[in-house]
Curated annotation (Swiss-Prot):
Keyword field contains Repeat: yes
LRR repeat boundaries on the chain: 151-177, 180-205, 228-252, 313-345, 346-371
Membrane spanning stretches: none
Keyword Ligase (UniProt): no
Gene3D superfamilies, sorted: 1.20.1280.50, Ribonuclease Inhibitor
The species this protein was found in: Arabidopsis thaliana (Mouse-ear cress)
Protein name, entry field: F-box/LRR-repeat protein At3g59190
Length: 388
């Protein structure tokens, strides 16, 4: 190969790309890696100042086997690194800010970063905060007109203690282990109603059994996933007014009542309703069964199940199947549109509602049983199918 061809082949083509394109490429890297490119050449030295996405994570360095002193040093250096990046970027527009970090008892440093990116008009905010204490979410997070996506999670509860919300552009909201200063339920309802463009709602580790009511009301919502941790108490009142919802994933203890259930557009539902441990004990007690015990006290899933009866695809947990037996004070509704049904099985759970459910699915095409790998009780299936 000639020296001329060698010289041509060794040209730094990437460095000759436009700044905007290079910054776009760097935006896909973790910020620590993007920052390391500044040593490649003078051309790269200040590109980080204009990268529109920041992905900051110090959890990858915080390993259990690492000594305490080393962990503290890494946390300190991480904070200094974030401070430098913030100073370098100044007030440049920011599209996404993702932060995973472990903090001590003082969250002011983290809150300062969050408030800074909010001032810069960030569109996507993704926070994972590992803390031994409740983390008070800065009120401004819930009063930001530029946010399109907000995801908040961590190792402990996040506290929302504000009375006003304003998130007019928010389309995606993911919250994990959130508690509200007012435990009555109104703040949660106000939060949802303040998100006029909301399309996806994910709530994990919710604890609303002590609320006076819980209401999910939004004409724009299309997908909802809610997983409630409470198991010992039945929620007092749960309502859904989501006429354009197409997908629902709902795990909760059966409520005392469901005053409003509006799922007019629902296509697919994954139902994980369950009874409290006391209700399960009473339901499975052979003496109670002998004396005709058929209904659990203090809970009624009938109105909720009536609300989902138009779905085309449905998944029922084994506990939800038992809820149909004991917690539906009205008859199990007819699922005229149901084509695909998946039922989780458990040898401890009552199957009495299954024959009725199948009779009430006149257009069912696919039936799948999720059977635990350690057991296959075909004799039970044969018995139930013989009665359908």
């Amino acid at each position: 190969m000639s020296s001329k061809r060698m010289d041509s082949g060794s040209k730094d083509i990437i460095s000759n790309l436009p700044d905007a394109l290079l910054c776009h490429v760097l935006s896909f890297l973790p910020t620590t890696e993007a920052a390391s490119t500044s040593v490649l050449a003078k051309r790269w030295r200040f590109l980080l100042a204009f990268v529109p996405n920041l992905d900051l994570d110090n959890m990858i360095y915080d390993r259990p086997k690492m000594g305490r002193r080393k962990r503290l040093e890494l946390r300190k250096s991480f904070k200094l690194f974030v401070d430098r990046v913030m100073a370098l970027q100044g007030n440049a527009p920011l599209k996404k800010f993702s932060l995973r970090c472990k903090i001590g008892s003082d969250p002011s440093r983290v809150n300062g970063w969050v408030l800074k990116v909010l001032d810069r008009g960030v569109e996507e905010l993704d926070l994972y905060i590992a803390s031994e204490y409740e983390y008070p979410l800065p009120p401004k997070v819930l009063m930001t007109k530029t946010l399109v996506s907000l995801k908040v999670s961590g190792t402990d509860e996040f506290t929302i203690d504000v009375g006003e919300f304003f998130l007019p552009k928010l389309k995606t909201l993911h919250l994990s282990a959130i508690s509200f200063g007012d435990e009555g339920g109104p703040p949660f309802a106000k939060l949802i109603s303040a998100c006029h463009a909301l399309e996806e709602l994910v709530m994990i580790k919710m604890m609303w059994d002590y609320w006076e009511f819980c209401s999910v009301s939004s004409p724009s919502l299309k997908r909802v996933s809610i997983d409630c941790e409470n198991i010992d108490e039945n929620p007092k009142s749960v309502s859904f007014d989501t006429p354009n919802l197409v997908y629902l994933e709902f795990t909760d203890t059966v409520a005392v009542k469901y005053p409003k259930v509006n799922f007019d557009s629902l296509v697919e539902a994954s139902i994980g309703l369950r009874m409290t441990p006391d209700q399960v004990f009473d339901a499975r007690d052979l003496v109670n069964r002998h004396h005709g015990y058929k209904r659990c006290k203090g809970a009624n899933a009938a109105d909720f199940m009536m609300g989902v009866c138009n779905v085309k695809t449905m998944y029922l947990s084994s506990e939800a199947l038992e809820v149909l037996t004991f917690c539906c004070k009205k008859a199990i509704p007819v699922f005229n549109n149901l084509i695909h049904l998946t039922v989780e099985t458990d040898e401890r759970v009552d199957w009495e509602s299954l024959p009725i459910l199948l009779k009430n699915c006149p257009n069912l095409e696919t039936l799948i049983f999720e059977v635990p790998s350690h057991i296959l009780f075909l004799h039970d299936l044969t018995h139930f199918f013989s009665n359908t």
